Amino acid sequence: MFCIGRGNHAPTPYILLFSAFILLLSSFLPISPSSALPPSVLMQYRRFGRTTLSMPVFSCGGMRYQHSWKDSPSWHIPRKNQANLEATIRRALEVGITHIETARGYGTSEIQLGRLLPRLPREKLIVQTKVSPKPDPQDFRHTLEQSLQNLRLEHIDLLGIHGINTPELLDYTVRPGGCLEVARAFQRAGRIRHIGFSTHAPTWVILQAIETDQFDYVNLHWYYINQDNWPAIEAAQRHDMGVFIISPSDKGGHLYDPPQTLVDLCAPLSPMVFNDLFCLSHPQVHTLSLGAARPSDFDEHLQVLPLLERAQELLPPILQRLEQAALDALGADWLSTWKLGLPAPEDTPGQINIPVILWLYNLLTAFDMADYAKARYNLLGQGGHWFPGQQAGDIDRWDLSKCLARSPHAQKIPKLLVETHRRLGGETVRRLSQS
C-alpha cells in the first residue's frame, strides 16, 4: 500500500487545498466504460429479461464500501471513506460495470452514492436500490421516498422489493393496496423504470413470487456450492425476468479466502474465478453481484471475461474433481439422498435448521471449508428470516424421530448434528447490517 505524505509532518493547508481541487476536478472527468481493459477482456453484457436493459455480467454491490450500517448525516462521513467509495464506483465504470446496486437497509450507502451519482453521465448508469416491504404501505412509501432523496436522481432504473423471504412478506407486497401498488405509483410518475424483488427465501416462496408475474427481475442466491434455487431461475426465464445473483463470492463460500483444498480442486482457476465462470456459463444468469469494498476488489473477477467462451473446455475437469472429492469424502449414497425428507426449521423441534447444518457438514467434510462453515453456522439463531433456524447445540432436549421419519438417514442425522455443532459451534455471528 502506498501512503501519500508518510512521516511525522502534517500536510500544510496548501497541500490540503490542492488535494481537494484534484478530487473535485476528477469528479468531472468523462468515464468510458471498459476503456481501462485491453480488448481481450472487455466487459460483456446480457439482456436483463423483460427490462431489455443491457446488463453487465458483473454488478457493483453497495454493502461493503459505505461508512456505516447505520444512517448518519452526510457531514459525519469521513472524507477518506467517501473518496474510497467514489474511487470504487469510478473503477467499476472504467471496466464497464455500469450497474450500481444498493439498498435503504445498507446504512449510509445510498446517501454516499447520492454525492457522486448526479455528477456522472446518467445515460451510462443502471441504478438499483431496494426497499423492504412493510405491513403498512404508507411506511413503505415514506421509506422509498427517502431512498430516492438520498440518491438525488430524477429516476432509478431498478427498484427491488427487498427481502421477500416469507409468505407473509410476499403478501405485504402483492396484496391489493400493498407495497407493490405504491411502487407502481412511483413507476407511473417516471421515478422508477422497472420493479423486481430480492430474496433469501426457500425456493417454494421464490417460485410463488415469480408466478405472480408482477416482477421484472429477481435477485437470488445460486452458485456452485448451493444450486437449490435453479428451479426459480428456470421459472424466471419463463417469465422473461432478469436474474441477478446475490453474493456469489461471500455467501458462495468466502472465495476471497479459500481453503487450500478448494484451491487445489479448482486449479488452474482460482475458486473465485471458477465460481464466476460456473455461474455465467448458464445464459439464464445475467449478472453477478460483486460487493466491492475498494477499487481493487474487481480485479480477480475480471479474469473470467476472456474465459467465458472457453467455459465448456475449462469447467468439466474442475467439476469432475469437485464431485469426486465429495464422493470420496461423503459416499455416493449420502450425496444422492441426504436432502430427502428433511423438515423445515419451523417443522423441527427447537427450530433446528437441519438442512443447512447438514449442508455445512458436507462442505466442511468434502472441501475443508471450515471458516465459511463456522461463519454460517454461528449466524443461525441471529439471522431472522434472512437466515432462519437454530443451531444444534441443545439437540439432547428434543426428540427428532417424528420430524425425520421420512429421511432415509433418520438414525444417522442426530449424530451428525452433534458432530457438526462440536466442530463449528463458537462465537455468535451477526448479519452485516447488525454489526
What are these regions (language model features)?
Residues 38-125, 413-435:
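N-terminal binding-site loop/beta-alpha segment at the start of enzyme catalytic domains
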Residues 59-63, 101-103, 128-130, 159-162, ...:
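A cross-family glycoside hydrolase active-site/sugar-binding cleft signature
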